[in-house]
A protein has these predicted regions:
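Short Pro-Gly-centered flexible turn/kink motifs
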Residues: 9, 159-176
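Asparagine-centered strand-capping/turn motif at beta-strand->loop junctions
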Residues: 10-15, 127-128, 175
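Short, structured beta-strand/loop micro-motifs enriched in basic residues and often containing a Trp
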Residues: 145-154
Length: 177
C-alpha cells in the first residue's frame, strides 16, 4: 500500500528471571531498486554516528575510528552506497527525530526510506565488497557482542527484560517522491 511495508516486533519475557534483549535485522536493499536505473544513480543517507573499531574477529574493541569523508557524507548529504567496500558498525544518531536509511534514485527522483525508529541504537552497514547490486543497512538495538563489551550498558544498547516485560518497536519501508 502507499504507506509501505511495516514490521512490528514485540519481545515478551515469559520466563521467571531477567533476560537480555538483543536484536538486529539483516536488511538487504537492492540498489538500484528500479530496473531502468544503475548503481551510479544511487545516493544513500544513514543516521550513523561514530564508527566502532573492530578486532580481527570482527568484534568491537570499545574504541572508535575516525569517519572517512565519504562516511561523513553518508550521514549528512548522502553518497553512493558503493564508495568503498563496507563491513562497518556505527552508533545510531537520529536526525529530525528519526533513525533511518534513505536511498535516493537520482534518475527517477524517488527515495526508498527505511525508518527504524529510535529504539535501534546501532547500525551495521555491509555492501558485499561494493558489489553495486545491494547493500545492507542493518539496524541493531545493541552493539554486537554487547554482553561481553566492558562499556556502560546505555552506550551499547544492552538492557534486560524483567519477567513479564515487553519491548516493542515498529520499522517501515516506504517510497517517497
Amino acid at each position: 500500500n502507499r504507506d509501505g511495508l511495516a514490521q512490528h516486533v514485540l519481545i515478551r519475557n515469559r520466563g521467571t528471571s531477567s533476560m537480555p534483549c538483543l536484536l538486529a535485522f539483516h536488511t538487504a536493499i537492492n540498489a538500484p531498486f528500479a530496473p531502468e536505473s544503475t548503481a551510479d544513480d544511487c545516493v544513500a543517507r544513514i543516521t550513523i554516528g561514530e564508527r566502532w573499531e573492530m578486532s580481527d574477529r570482527m568484534l568491537p574493541t570499545g574504541e572508535f575510528q575516525s569517519l572517512t569523508a565519504e562516511e561523513e557524507r553518508l550521514r549528512t548529504s548522502g553518497v553512493n552506497p558503493y564508495f568503498a567496500p563496507m563491513d562497518n558498525h556505527y552508533t545510531a544518531v537520529p536526525q529530525n527525530g528519526r533513525n533511518r536509511m534513505e536511498l535516493t534514485d537520482t534518475r527517477l527522483g524517488k527515495t526508498l526510506v527505511y525508518d527504524v525508529g529510535n529504539s535501534y541504537k546501532q547500525w551495521m552497514v555491509w555492501n558485499n565488497k561494493a558489489s553495486r547490486k545491494f547493500f545492507c543497512p542493518e539496524p541493531q538495538i545493541n552493539l554486537v557482542n554487547a554482553p561481553n563489551v566492558n562499556l556502560p550498558a546505555d552506550d551499547i544498547g544492552l538492557f534486560g527484560l524483567a519477567p513479564g516485560d515487553i519491548w516493542e518497536a515498529t520499522s517501515r519501508l516506504y517510497l517517497k517522491g
